[in-house]
């Protein structure tokens, strides 16, 4: 009723202070407490190079729809790409080489079909907050919006990358980084005294854990090079190399790790067994699923102990099936919009992994996210089994993630947490974003 009683343009106008705040309690909590608090975006996919270089985008399509990297891989907001594909837009306008103006037109024409999808509000709010546009984007308004946004992007000092971050009152950004990354751009950011917010790397060792996926042996060669070795000849060499890289990340300000797993495994094995499995795969043979789980469990326990030692938070993102469209995944590569919710049941394995770390008092602070909302209650009950006096809320139920990152999904996640744990100790939301415009909600009510 709140939105039906107003034109959508009016909903986004700056004077509408109560957008999304539909009760006196919500208004009180936001305006009197939350509105002026800084944002700590502890998990995102924003490229640190663009922060250091203070990139100025040429047009709104570059910001929203991305493009192709020099190495041929693709970058951009796959949420928007999925909207376009669902509206029948040919791929050449999405990740292809069509002119940016034409790509933007196709997105604008698709957006009105997205009522009920958070993309609709996200897009129009970004136009309102950062560009002062109080209309709504569609095929008819695309030219007007294109010209307005591009003029501001090219000339407004507040619309460089750093300008967007600063005006959004962002205090902390946690990027997502591979263990082999030299963190060059993080070093440059740390050395630049004009950057007032903190940008910290996060340790994402998926490629060193996924022994059963293509490219593992090649990646281990790169990990060896990162620690000054010709090769990693044994499992001790692997754990030593990972420890070396974790310590380097910690020196660079790393506060968190992140693990993107199909499911969380737990299968015990001796060091000798795991070494044999590693040697087998490095020799070009294929390991069984059970062998992969033994290796993964061994590495995860080792990493968990290092995180605890160094005060790094361990994050698990699981229950996602990635690249399920084989043809398009082969053509475009990962993280291009062909992933789905999985239904793996691994609550017992999560508990066993935490218990193994807890046995030696080396369980780190942990945040657990599942892409399947059906796991929320199970996660909520796992938390209470491993809390202790080290810190309130040591084990966290991660915020609604990815396909659950909308009003219904966030309410359901917080309701589960509140009913099974302590909502007051929740670490809160993050952007998980690849876009510098994703801090919109911090400015809606200013």
Q: Model-predicted segments: where are they?
A:
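Hydrophobic faces of well-ordered beta-strands that scaffold small-molecule active sites
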Residues: 40-42, 174-175, 199-205, 257-259, ...
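Histidine-centered divalent metal-coordination motifs
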Residues: 43-47, 317, 445
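Single conserved hydrophobic/aromatic residue that forms the stacking wall/gate
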Residues: 1-12, 444-445
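Histidine/acidic residue-rich metal-binding segments in metalloenzymes
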Residues: 28-31, 153-166, 182-198, 218-365, ...
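An N-terminal structural lobe/cap that precedes and organizes the functional/catalytic core
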Residues: 10-99
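Alpha-helical scaffold segments that flank or form the walls of functional sites
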Residues: 60-191, 239-255
């Amino acid at each position: 009723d709140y939105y039906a009683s107003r034109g959508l343009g009016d909903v986004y106008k700056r004077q509408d202070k109560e957008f999304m705040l539909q009760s006196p309690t919500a208004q009180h909590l936001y305006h009197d407490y939350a509105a002026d608090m800084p944002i700590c975006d502890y998990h995102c996919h924003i490229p640190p190079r663009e922060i250091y270089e203070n990139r100025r985008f040429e047009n709104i399509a570059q910001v929203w729809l991305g493009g192709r990297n020099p190495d041929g891989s693709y970058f951009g907001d796959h949420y928007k790409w999925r909207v376009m594909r669902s509206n029948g837009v040919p791929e050449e306008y999405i990740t292809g080489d069509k002119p940016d103006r034409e790509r933007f037109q196709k997105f604008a024409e698709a957006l009105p079909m997205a009522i009920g999808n958070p993309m609709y509000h996200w897009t129009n709010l970004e136009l309102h907050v950062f560009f002062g546009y109080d209309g709504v984007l569609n095929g008819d308004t695309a030219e007007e919006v294109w010209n307005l946004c591009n003029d501001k992007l090219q000339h407004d000092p507040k619309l460089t990358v750093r300008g967007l971050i600063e005006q959004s009152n962002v205090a902390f950004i946690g990027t997502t980084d591979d263990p082999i990354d030299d963190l060059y751009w993080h070093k440059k950011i740390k050395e630049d005294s004009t950057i007032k917010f903190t940008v910290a790397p996060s340790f994402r060792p998926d490629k060193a854990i996924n022994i059963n996926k293509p490219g593992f042996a090649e990646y281990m060669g790169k990990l060896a090079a990162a620690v000054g070795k010709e090769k990693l000849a044994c499992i001790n060499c692997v754990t030593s190399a990972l420890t070396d890289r974790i310590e380097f990340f910690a020196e660079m300000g790393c506060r968190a790790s992140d693990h993107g797993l199909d499911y969380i495994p737990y299968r015990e094995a001796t060091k000798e067994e795991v070494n044999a499995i590693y040697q087998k795969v490095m020799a070009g043979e294929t390991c069984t699923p059970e062998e992969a789980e033994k290796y993964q469990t061994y590495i995860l326990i080792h990493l968990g102990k290092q995180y605890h030692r160094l005060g790094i938070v361990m994050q698990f993102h699981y229950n996602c099936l990635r690249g399920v469209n084989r043809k398009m995944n082969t053509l475009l590569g990962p993280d291009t919009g062909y992933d789905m919710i999985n239904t793996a049941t691994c609550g017992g394995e999560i508990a066993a992994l935490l218990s193994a770390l807890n046995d030696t008092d080396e369980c780190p602070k942990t945040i657990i996210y599942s892409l399947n909302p059906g796991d929320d209650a199970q996660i909520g009950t796992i938390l209470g089994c491993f809390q202790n006096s080290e810190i309130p809320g040591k084990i966290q139920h991660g915020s609604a993630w990815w396909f659950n990152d909308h009003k219904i999904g966030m309410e359901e996640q917080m309701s589960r947490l509140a009913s099974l744990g302590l909502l007051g100790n929740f670490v809160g939301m993050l952007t998980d974003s690849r876009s510098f415009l994703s801090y919109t909600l911090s400015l809606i009510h200013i």
